[in-house]
Curated annotation (Swiss-Prot):
The gene is naa20. Component of the N-terminal acetyltransferase B (NatB) complex which is composed of naa20 and naa25. This is N-alpha-acetyltransferase 20. GO terms for biological process: N-terminal peptidyl-aspartic acid acetylation; N-terminal peptidyl-glutamic acid acetylation; N-terminal peptidyl-glutamine acetylation; N-terminal protein amino acid acetylation; regulation of actin cytoskeleton organization. Residues 2-157 form the N-acetyltransferase domain. It comes from Danio rerio (Zebrafish).
Length: 178
């Protein structure tokens, strides 16, 4: 039976099998520790019965309440290749959405590579829609051009009029993101 639990510092030494995917953004240990210290409830791991890590989600709460922009943000979601197509990503997303609801968020958002159609389709099936395109959001490392991202959003119950998911008509640049 899969266990969904809070991510711990010890998990930093056990999740390399998940981060080997070329579409998974990886960060230095201080970055993960910052999230663990500031937003521990948004950092969740899926663990197999034998203790092997199957996947994780890392996020945060951010934005302005006054401007109805307080929201949950998915910084990273990844499932190890051998545990894909089991519904783990959907379950992890559901947990982050529930936490964001409890925190009074208007929506949940995330960024995904335009080329990652498997992920884009999964997010659409989970109720997310493309809010805007962010030009050259992802830096290329091998001489390839930088890649655009979709900023995808799902309105939560606090956004009764669904204003947070009305798509922007034009793409934006990374420096224009608040």
């Amino acid at each position: 039976m899969t266990t969904l639990r809070a991510f711990t510092c010890d998990d930093l030494f056990k999740f390399n099998n998940i981060n080997l995917d070329p579409l998974t953004e990886t960060y230095g240990i201080p970055f993960y520790l910052q999230y663990l210290a500031h937003w521990p409830e948004y950092f969740i791991v899926a663990e197999a019965p034998g203790g092997e890590l199957m996947g994780y989600i890392m996020g945060k709460a951010e934005g302005s309440v006054a401007r109805e922009e307080w929201h949950g943000h998915v910084t990273a979601l990844s499932v190890a290749p051998e545990f894909r197509r089991l519904g783990l990503a959907a379950k992890l997303m559901e947990m982050l959405e529930e936490i964001s609801e409890r925190k009074g968020g208007f929506f949940v958002d995330l960024f995904v590579r335009v080329s990652n159609q498997v992920a884009v389709n999964m997010y659409k099936q989970l109720g997310y829609s493309v809010y805007r395109t962010v030009i050259e959001y992802y830096s290329a490392s091998n001489g390839e051009p930088d890649e655009d991202a979709y900023d995808m959003r799902k309105a939560l119950s606090r956004d009764t009029e669904k204003k947070s998911i009305i798509p922007l008509p034009h793409p934006v640049r990374p420096e224009d993101i608040e």
